């Protein structure tokens, strides 16, 4: 879903535009989750925020190809939050898909097709219709 559409509908703001106390709380939550889950996590990744649409589109393309996207989603998140890579770049997304045993090049090409973008737009509309206000959200 397109968070740039969803956030303003509920009065939400991107992290960089939030007041200092909300940014501080965000940082505290990251630290709590890192400790709770015992995972690697950069609190301020080099490439965040970034354009998340390419990552969403490659996940949609994988799903449309019949793949379970749980591992791919995790690999993409690791690229950003652990490995300091930009998930707006094709090379990063292709590498993430390949690491999951998928054909990253084929999925990258599929992610640029109209049906992937239409699904992205439909996901955004569904999120809006169901009053989603942020991410992650599970419907």
What kind of feature is each model-predicted range?
Residues 1-80:
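Structural alpha/beta surface segment adjacent to cysteine/selenocysteine redox centers
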Residues 1, 64-67, 71, 75-139:
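C-terminal cap of thioredoxin/glutaredoxin-like
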């Amino acid at each position: 879903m397109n968070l740039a559409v969803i956030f303003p509908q509920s009065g939400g703001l991107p992290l960089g535009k939030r007041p200092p106390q909300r940014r501080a709380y965000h940082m505290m939550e990251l630290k709590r989750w890192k400790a709770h889950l015992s995972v690697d996590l950069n609190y301020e990744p080099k490439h965040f925020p970034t354009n998340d649409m390419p990552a969403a589109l490659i996940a949609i393309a994988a799903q449309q190809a019949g793949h379970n996207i749980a591992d791919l989603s995790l690999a993409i998140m690791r690229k950003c939050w652990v490995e300091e890579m930009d998930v707006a770049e094709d090379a990063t997304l292709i590498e993430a898909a390949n690491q999951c045993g998928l054909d990253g090049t084929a999925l990258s090409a599929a992610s640029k097709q109209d049906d992937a973008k239409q699904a992205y737009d439909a996901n955004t509309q569904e999120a809006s219709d169901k009053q989603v206000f942020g991410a992650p959200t599970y419907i």
